[in-house]
Structure formats: C-alpha cells, structure tokens
C-alpha cells in the first residue's frame, strides 16, 4: 500500500464507521474508481482499533458510570438509569452476535457485490429520512426499555448486509422508537463498542491463523488517522445533529448509491 492509500482508507474508516452513510459503500469505492487492491486483514484490524479507541475515549465518562452502576446494582431490583443502559447495550448486542455467526458465510458469498451495496445504501437511506421526518423524537436515552433495546439490536443485525450502515440502521430504529436525534446517536455509538471489539477480535484470530506480511508503519499510521478522524466525527456529529437532522446524510447516500449503480451498469 502507498502512503496515499493508507491515509485515504484510514480516514474513510474513521469517518464512515460512525456517520450514517455506510462504511462498506465507501471502502468499495477505491477499488471501483481507482482499482486499488484489498487493504489486507492486518490493516483492517489496525483501523478498527483506532475507531474503537476513539469511541471509548469519547464516551469514557458514560462507560465508567455504566460499569460502576451495572456491577453495583445491575442484578438488583433497584436499577439506576446507567445500570439499565448497560443492560440495554448488552441486549442490543445479542442479535448481531447470533446473526453474525449464523449468516456470515452467506453474506460474504452473496451480498458483497457493488449492486447490493448500492441498493442498500439508497434503500436504507430513504428509511432513515422517513424515520427522521415522521417520528416523535421526544424520548431520552434513559427512556428506553429492554424491548426498544432489542428492536435496535435486531435492526443492527441488518447491518451485516453491506451498504446498510450499522450506525445508520441503529439510528433509524432509535428514531422510529421516538428517541431524539442525539439520544439515538449516543446509543448507536455506545452500541458500536462491543460490535467493533468483537469484529476486531475475530479479524485478529483470522490474522493469527493466516498471517499477512505486516507493514508496521502502515498499521501505526492507519490506526492513528482512524482514531483522529473517528473522534472528530463523533464530536462534530453529536454537536450538530439536533440542528441539521439526517437529511444531509440521506442526500449524500442517494448520490453515493447512484454513483455505484452507474459503475455497476456502465
């Protein structure tokens, strides 16, 4: 990989991991437009580590409160808001784990085409627009129940289909359940932690069993750039989402999907 490829791919990973615009749609663009080869498993692990560190550091206060509350009262009848939120993250993670193990082979075999990614980018983008426009948007993250957490988790399982966007579909589900935009985004970001961690561990196991030739300079640069871009993305998104809404991201997804379709049928 050249330095230009490392920089572009790491920044793409950091930004698209948390914006509702589909990371897989963007990661396929360099190969479609520029003919770049796959970045390799080791680099994929490195940029995911950068993204994971970014979200964990940004939400370190929330994570600390949730862990303290969960270990303190998570198994008692006197639940606190933070202990319940910890449970909701756990519950919402379970469907992705189940469907991830059950459907991984099928998805990798049949759902990673540019056509599938283009269609899901457009289709789930329109669903995001509908949720943002029609939902009540008046509930706080602490108003969630185990049922709403499970619904968001089921939605997250759909993100195994490339082009769906994990953050996009979980925010869509949160909005449809009546969460305000910031709460939907915060829960989506908290939910990303176990998912990215799990995906990173699986990729690491694959890497150990079939090791690539490792370019440590590329991995370090990729991880750092992914961390910086992901942290900035989370900060700016939460600062602006209540004011700008989801429409800019929906429009962007429509354009991106159309571009991919043009290349598919060109």
Curated annotation (Swiss-Prot):
Keyword hit for Membrane: yes
One GO term of the cellular component aspect?
A: plasma membrane
MF terms (GO), sorted A to Z: undecaprenyl-diphosphatase activity
Task: Show the Pfam families listed in the entry.
Answer: BacA
Class of the enzyme per the UniProt entry, highest EC level: hydrolase
Residue ranges annotated as transmembrane are 1-21, 39-59, 87-107, 111-131, 150-172, 187-207, 218-238, 244-264
Reactions the enzyme catalyzes: di-trans,octa-cis-undecaprenyl diphosphate + H2O = di-trans,octa-cis-undecaprenyl phosphate + phosphate + H(+)
The record's keywords, sorted A to Z, are: Antibiotic resistance, Cell inner membrane, Cell membrane, Cell shape, Cell wall biogenesis/degradation, Hydrolase, Membrane, Peptidoglycan synthesis, Transmembrane, Transmembrane helix
EC numbers on record = 3.6.1.27
Write down the InterPro entries for this protein, in alphabetical order: UppP (IPR003824)
Q: Topology in the membrane? A: Multi-pass membrane protein
- Asked if Ribonucleoprotein is a keyword of the record, the answer is no
- Localized where? Cell inner membrane
GO terms for biological process, alphabetical? cell wall organization; peptidoglycan biosynthetic process; regulation of cell shape; response to antibiotic
Protein's job: Catalyzes the dephosphorylation of undecaprenyl diphosphate (UPP). Confers resistance to bacitracin.
Q: Which PANTHER family match?
A: UNDECAPRENYL-DIPHOSPHATASE
Miscellaneous comment as given in the Swiss-Prot or TrEMBL entry: Bacitracin is thought to be involved in the inhibition of peptidoglycan synthesis by sequestering undecaprenyl diphosphate, thereby reducing the pool of lipid carrier available.
Q: Which family does it belong to?
A: Belongs to the UppP family.
User: What's the protein here called?
Assistant: Undecaprenyl-diphosphatase
What would be the name of the gene that encodes this protein?
A: uppP
């Amino acid at each position: 990989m050249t330095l230009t490829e490392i920089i572009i791919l790491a920044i793409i990973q950091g930004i698209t991991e948390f914006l509702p615009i589909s990371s897989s749609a963007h990661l396929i663009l360099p190969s479609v437009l520029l003919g770049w080869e796959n970045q390799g498993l080791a680099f994929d692990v490195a940029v995911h580590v950068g993204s994971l560190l970014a979200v964990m550091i940004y939400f370190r206060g929330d994570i600390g409160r949730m862990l303290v509350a969960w270990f303190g009262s998570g198994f008692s009848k006197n639940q606190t808001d933070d202990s319940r939120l910890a449970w909701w993250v756990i519950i919402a993670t379970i469907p992705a784990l189940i469907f991830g193990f059950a459907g991984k082979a099928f998805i990798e075999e049949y759902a990673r085409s540019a056509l599938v990614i283009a269609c899901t980018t457009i289709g789930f983008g329109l669903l995001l627009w509908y949720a943002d426009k029609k939902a009540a948007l008046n509930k706080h993250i602490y108003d969630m129940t185990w049922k709403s957490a499970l619904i968001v988790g089921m939605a997250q399982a759909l993100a195994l289909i490339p082009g769906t966007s994990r953050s996009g579909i979980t925010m869509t589900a949160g909005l449809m359940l009546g969460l305000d935009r910031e709460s939907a985004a915060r829960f989506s970001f908290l939910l990303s932690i176990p998912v990215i961690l799990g995906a990173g561990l699986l990729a690491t196991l694959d890497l150990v069993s079939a090791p690539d030739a490792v370019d440590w300079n590329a991995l370090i640069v990729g991880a750092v750039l992914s961390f910086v871009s992901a942290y900035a993305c989370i900060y700016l998104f939460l600062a602006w989402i209540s004011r700008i809404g989801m429409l800019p991201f929906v429009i962007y997804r429509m354009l991106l999907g159309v571009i991919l379709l043009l290349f598919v049928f060109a």
